[in-house]
UniProtKB/Swiss-Prot annotation:
GO cellular component: nucleus; P-body
Species, as recorded: Chlorocebus tantalus (Tantalus monkey)
Pathway: Protein modification; protein ubiquitination
Gene: TRIM5
Occurrences of domain B30.2/SPRY (ranges): 283-515
Gene Ontology terms: biological process: activation of innate immune response; autophagy; defense response to virus; innate immune response; positive regulation of canonical NF-kappaB signal transduction; positive regulation of MAPK cascade; positive regulation of NF-kappaB transcription factor activity; protein K63-linked ubiquitination
Protein name as annotated: Tripartite motif-containing protein 5
PANTHER family: E3 UBIQUITIN-PROTEIN LIGASE TRIM
Record-stated family: Belongs to the TRIM/RBCC family.
Length: 515
């Protein structure tokens, strides 16, 4: 029993690297102890392989060299153990063959087993390659050391694979969480769009119901009156036929002619096959439009209007609103500011002026177009204009003019890109158009192209990409539907936001980014 205890103690104070009793033992923070020479050699190997962290050869827990401590207690145990000599019986159990009792001196290569000389001659090991343990111990020590290094390298690869897998797992989680957020946002937008479309469609159906039922109710009343008239006429005829001869003949020709000339009034009908057919909205297209609008809104700038004493337009104190003011010019005597007015014109272009020096004012133009204070010379810019309840307006961008400059009317009245205007407009309440360059036959008149706008916008978004040379207009009321886009604009000069309320007293309002 004492020998068993000694063997166990010996195992506890044996170096895991060299498998010998510890020499100058050093302990790591994890609790494992090694010979000073062995752990030092391990450090050098770590530096050779450029490992960032040093780890325990047994449990692979990282440690810092300064945390290694000499273990004097273990050193004392090793010294005492070296002084203890096992009894012959105990030594026999450790170093002698359990079968033959002979000392174990040989190594069988085929069976990878330590044997005695009698085992070598037995049938079990006959013909095997056997060597003295001293002859092969160093060779196998080198092989085991090589295997250990290979295993450590594979362990490093395994740890890297583990770290890569953990990193990929985290990356996937982040990506999927991001996709979840986007999906939720997209479906929330779709729900909003669907709610709006449903409400709009129901409103259309309610209006259709109101109009049709109102008309049919009117027709029903007329049919009731017509039927009642027929009843009264039939009753009159029956009375004549049943009465005296005098009653029969009294005014008979007039009654007969009235009956012969009578035509039944037919009710107004509505054909169901001619009704507007409901079609489900293109959700993907609408969502793409909404995403494009969300993207350009990232470049929203706070635009204000430049003061304008020339243009016949009223700018609010907050410089966000412009409205048309109906001109009221009173006649004054010659020599005063205003004399008689002839050939009076209302012009709704960019600001212009004409000096008034005599008592007669001819061909006077009132202008209602105004510019934004901020010039655009690079980058991307976006703003929105509230045009609700207006029956006419023009908006977009204007290039080449300073907000406080006085221009020539004849030069600036043409809304053409070649003159520095990239604008769209509304007139007569429902006619939308874009102003393009005139033809070679009419170079001084813009070519006005009608625009198909299904839902009239209460708010219009304007997006300028200076580097891409584009100006885009969005129908905010219709989920950001693209109204029109100018491409290949020649922005050779700074451009300014342009608003023109035209001859409509309802104001145009620049919306703040927070609205």
């Amino acid at each position: 029993m004492a020998s068993g205890i000694l063997v166990n103690v010996k195992e506890e104070v044996t170096c895991p690297i060299c498998l010998e009793l510890l020499t100058e033992p050093l302990s790591l923070p994890c609790g494992h102890s090694f010979c000073q020479a062995c752990i030092t050699a391990n450090h050098k190997e770590s530096m050779l392989y450029k490992e960032e962290e040093r780890s325990c050869p047994v449990c692979r827990i990282s440690y810092q060299p300064e945390n290694i401590q000499p273990n004097r207690h273990v050193a004392n145990i090793v010294e005492k153990l070296r002084e203890v000599k096992l009894s012959p019986e105990e030594g026999q159990k450790v170093d002698h063959c359990a079968r033959h009792g002979e000392k174990l001196l040989l190594f069988c290569q085929e069976d990878s087993k330590v044997i005695c000389w009698l085992c070598e001659r037995s049938q079990e090991h006959r013909g095997h390659h056997t060597f003295l343990m001293e002859e092969v111990a160093q060779e196998y020590h080198v092989k085991l050391q090589t295997a250990l290094e290979m295993l450590r390298q594979k362990q490093q690869e395994a740890e890297k694979l583990e770290a890569d897998t953990r990193e990929e797992k985290a990356s996937w989680k982040i990506q999927i969480d991001y996709d979840k957020t986007n999906v939720s946002a997209d479906f929330e937008q779709l729900r909003e769009i669907l709610d709006w479309e449903e409400s709009n469609e129901l409103q259309n159906l309610e209006k259709e119901e109101e109009d049709i039922l109102k008309s049919l109710t009117k027709s029903e009343t007329e049919m009731v009156q017509q039927t009642q008239y027929m009843r009264e006429l039939i009753s009159d005829l029956e009375h004549r036929l049943q009465g005296s001869m005098m009653e029969l003949l009294q005014g008979v020709d007039g009654i007969i002619k009235r009956i012969e000339n009578m035509t039944l009034k037919k009710p107004k009908t509505f054909h169901k096959n001619q009704r507007r057919v409901f079609r489900a909205p293109d959700l993907k297209g609408m969502l793409d439009m909404f995403r494009e609008l969300t993207d350009v809104r990232r470049y929203w700038v706070d635009v204000t209007l430049a003061p304008n004493n020339i243009s016949h337009a009223v700018i609010a104190e907050d410089k966000r609103q412009v409205s048309y003011q109906n001109p009221q010019i009173m006649y004054q005597a010659p020599g005063s500011l205003f004399g008689s007015l002839t050939n009076f014109n209302y012009y709704t272009g960019v600001r212009g002026s004409q000096s008034i020096t005599s008592g007669k004012l001819t061909n006077f133009n009132y202008c209602t177009g105004v510019l934004g204070s901020q010039s655009i010379t690079s980058g991307k810019h976006y703003w929105e204009v509230d045009v609700s309840k207006k029956s006419a307006w023009i908006l977009g961008v204007c290039a080449g003019f300073q907000p406080d400059a006085t221009y020539n009317i004849e030069q600036n009245e043409n809304y053409q890109p070649k003159y520095g205007y990239w604008v769209i407009g509304l007139q007569e309440g429902d006619k939308y158009s874009v102003f393009q360059d005139g033809s070679s036959h009419t170079p001084f008149a813009p070519f006005i192209v009608p625009l198909s706008v299904i839902i009239c916008p209460d708010r219009v978004g304007v997006f300028v990409d200076y580097e891409a040379c584009t100006v885009s207009f969005f129908n905010i009321t219709n989920h950001g539907f693209l109204i029109y886009k100018f491409s290949q604009c020649s922005f050779s000069k700074p451009v300014f936001p342009y608003l023109n309320p035209r001859k409509c007293t309802v104001p145009m309002t620049l919306c703040s980014p927070s609205s």
